[in-house]
Curated annotation (Swiss-Prot):
CTP binds at S18, D153, I154, E155, K193, T194, K195, P196, T197, Q198, K229. It comes from Prosthecochloris aestuarii (strain DSM 271 / SK 413). This is CTP synthase. The gene is pyrG. Allosterically activated by GTP, when glutamine is the substrate; GTP has no effect on the reaction when ammonia is the substrate. The allosteric effector GTP functions by stabilizing the protein conformation that binds the tetrahedral intermediate(s) formed during glutamine hydrolysis. Inhibited by the product CTP, via allosteric rather than competitive inhibition. Belongs to the CTP synthase family. L-glutamine binds at Y59, G363, L391, G392, M393, Q394, E414, R471. ATP binds at S19, L20, G21, K22, G23, I24, D76.
Amino acid sequence: MARPKNVKHIFVTGGVVSSLGKGILSASLGLLLKSRGLRVAIQKYDPYINVDPGTMSPYQHGEVYVTDDGAETDLDLGHYERFLDEATSQQSNLTMGRVYKSVIDKERQGEYLGGTVQVVPHVIDEIKERMGELAKNSNLDILITEIGGTIGDIESLPFLEAMRQLKLDFGPKNMLNIHLTLVPYIKAACELKTKPTQHSVKMLLETGIQPDILVCRSEKPLSREIKNKVGHFCNLHELDVIGLSDCDTIYGVPLMLLNEKLDIRVLKKLGLKKYKEPDLAYWKEFCNKVQHPTDGEVTIAICGKYTEYPDAYKSILESLVHAGADNNVRVHVRLIRAEDAEENGSDVKTALEGVHGVLVAPGFGDRGIEGKIRFVQYARENNIPFLGICLGMQCASIEFARNVCGLSEANSTEFSKRCRQPVIDLMEHQKKVKEKGGTMRLGSYPCILKEGTKAHQAYDKFLINERHRHRYEFNNEYRRLFEDNGMVFSGTSPNGELVEIVEISNHRWFVAVQFHPEYKSRVHCVHPLFSGFVAAAKEFAHGARQLSFEPEAPSFQVMPGAEN
């Protein structure tokens, strides 16, 4: 395989245990190299057989991150975008399922000329071809590829073999491997143990790959003695053993790696000599705001269906960190399980005690819906800043229909197929869709904002583009009734047909959106809705003068025929 001219490749692998932070390492290295004036992109290769994570349970996979071009991808792509301030795409995430599907499709079309299709060479060649696509189609200096999984997993072997072959094809000056491992601290012995790292490197060597740089995660900083020992047993110079001890925030990782001179070692090994000194002044200022806010703290309640597994809301959590720094406050997040308000008769007032903002999170299915609706109602009636996202917007619409518009049977056809008052309904083009994978309304779409609304005030422009992931929408048959009762439709599709944003004008801050603003919040560009939401929570927390506000009493202006 020919290497795209001048593109250097870095492969990041992980060993010992999963969830060590390969994505954060890749994003941090990318940031350091970009700050030196290099053009960098990052891609993620996942070893599972699913074509994409779109149909996977949030409990198993965490958040599904959606790109501008509508790809449903791994949550690590969110880290790449937040750190590098560069958009990713479908090309940025490859699964083994997509590789096998492509190989099988080619076999069915006769492209292998009757040959026996095997992992070697056909699957490996497919992987190698895909590994170079992003480099071919982009103006890059460096392409970082994160290999998912842990060394020793059988699923990762084809990716590792492709990586081994590429190093032979490209040459050592054009490709290197960074291996992330764990150096556990044993409290009983008061000692860092290097044996797991040694065994992980041994397993990597069995695949024919000698790591060029080791990054060692640990609770405590690595001494020079430990680095020397690890290097001695893993065939590396001690300068190529990088320590990465625990940080208070993931945004401190690039600064720690800068101090460890990881970027300098990478540049030297790749033969890159012309580069500028990194300028991370903004990043340092951001980290200082995150760790040492000057205006106190706020508590935001996230009401969701998957709160037992916070990675399901990874981009939302990080967006709140960004918004907190933007408002000079520390954001404490209280994760609230939506079903608790249904199953245990939970007191919503008690659950939200001390909360300065309520966020009803995205999700699918009817589990926990009535609980979410109760939390929406409490936030609306008690003038607590509120943000609803995707399903959260739909729950806000249902709550408003029931408790303000007098539509007691209002619901979504997602939860009740024969709903008599469907304020949320399946989109017309979705009604004939049978397959689940990759068939939702996905990716970036334009939205027109209404002047004088909170949404327009936050964005400070009339045309925006946001990323979507949904099948259901607000039923336009009810728009007039909602408007008559005080709901403002502050954002719609350019043709005015699809409701994107709803808000209540006489509420402190009540905004709900059909799209996913969390996918576009970055360190360098905090999302305006999250910033506005946290600003309202900050004002609420600091006891600012409350707006003159009374909850809307049910007006019972029923649509003609709605009582039937």
